[in-house]
């Protein structure tokens, strides 16, 4: 389900934050978010529940928590500015929401890059119904 939603968004030509986040992930991991992170574990992709499966999935859990704190922002659609140089992502100027959203995405992309060694193919396209452990608090 998570994969279908992300593919639908991309097919509709949305130019917002999800595409920017995808680019950040590509910069830090050298992998495309789709298919590698669009439905990985219990938290990478749309939604999330249960206990993160590994450090890679925990990056997505923390990212979800970060977005959850931005109650007055639109983190999945607001466009922000950022740049990168030799693998370092720098969030640019903008509204407070844009800066905070960018920082959530930057931190998650950096986390995914730092945890490439924990990535396990068995958690790609992981079904939600297997995420039954009690969810952790942010």
Swiss-Prot record:
CDD domains: PLA2c
Cross-referenced Pfam families: Phospholip_A2_1
Effect of residue 22 to E: 10% loss of PA2 activity and 90% loss of toxicity
Amino acids binding Ca(2+): 43, 45, 47, 64
Disulfide bridge positions per record: 42-131, 44-60, 59-111, 65-138, 66-104, 73-97, 91-102
Signal peptide: 1-16
GO MF annotations in UniProt: calcium ion binding; calcium-dependent phospholipase A2 activity; phospholipid binding; toxin activity
Function, in words: Snake venom phospholipase A2 (PLA2) that displays edema-inducing activities, as well as presynaptic neurotoxicity and low myotoxicity. PLA2 catalyzes the calcium-dependent hydrolysis of the 2-acyl groups in 3-sn-phosphoglycerides.
Family: Belongs to the phospholipase A2 family. Group II subfamily. D49 sub-subfamily.
Listed PANTHER family: PHOSPHOLIPASE A2 FAMILY MEMBER (PTHR11716), PHOSPHOLIPASE A2, MEMBRANE ASSOCIATED (PTHR11716:SF9)
Full protein name: Basic phospholipase A2 trimucrotoxin
Species whose genome carries this gene: Protobothrops mucrosquamatus (Taiwan habu)
